[in-house]
């Protein structure tokens, strides 16, 4: 589950609903521990007793963002994981390439990548590209009335690719479809 650091209330609700869909299922939620959508995904996973994996752009001795350090500890205390390719003592201020590497790892660890909210450009779009390159299933939230706002421009762009006969596995999710998905998952046997 990935998206903007500047989460809007609609997206907050969507992330919570989407993750709640997996309650009582043997799945782990992967995200990047950033503020906004990532933070919401990890918190929702913990609230629903799901394991969560936080992929870091930094080393374990320099958890970023610092504001989510306690969340990182809570993830581990609840059986989740912190994943990084940087050893302790790595530079304190990660370079842009660290975030791109984090996005690559997130996509690689996931069977399905859910884009909750994305503007253009941004790290979320990088994660979407990795997901498609790795032939992962990509699910993109499609807002109803707010779909033309800046916060969903990345979502809109990705969903436009569905209609261009691209050989991509992109799913569109509206809030109603997430509820239907929740009901079907409740009946599914993983």
Which residues are covered by each model-predicted region?
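Glycine-biased, small-residue-rich flexible motifs in mid-sequence functional cores and linkers
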Residues: 2-190
């Amino acid at each position: 589950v990935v998206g903007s650091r500047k989460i809007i209330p609609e997206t907050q609700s969507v992330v919570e609903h989407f993750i709640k869909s997996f309650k009582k299922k043997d799945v782990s939620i992967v995200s990047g521990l950033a503020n906004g959508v990532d933070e919401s995904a990890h918190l929702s996973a913990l609230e629903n007793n799901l394991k969560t994996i936080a992929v870091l752009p930094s080393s374990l001795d320099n958890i970023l963002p610092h504001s989510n350090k306690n969340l990182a500890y809570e993830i581990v205390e609840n059986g989740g994981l912190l994943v990084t390719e940087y050893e302790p003592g790595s530079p304190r201020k990660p370079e842009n390439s660290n975030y791109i590497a984090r996005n690559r790892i997130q996509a690689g660890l996931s069977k399905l990548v859910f884009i909750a909210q994305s503007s253009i450009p941004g790290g979320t779009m990088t994660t979407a590209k990795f997901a498609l390159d790795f032939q992962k299933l990509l699910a993109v939230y499609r807002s109803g009335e707010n779909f033309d706002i800046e916060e969903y421009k990345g979502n809109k762009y990705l969903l436009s690719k569905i209609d261009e006969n691209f050989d991509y596995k992109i799913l569109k999710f509206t809030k109603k479809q997430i509820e239907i998905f929740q009901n079907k998952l409740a009946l599914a046997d993983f």
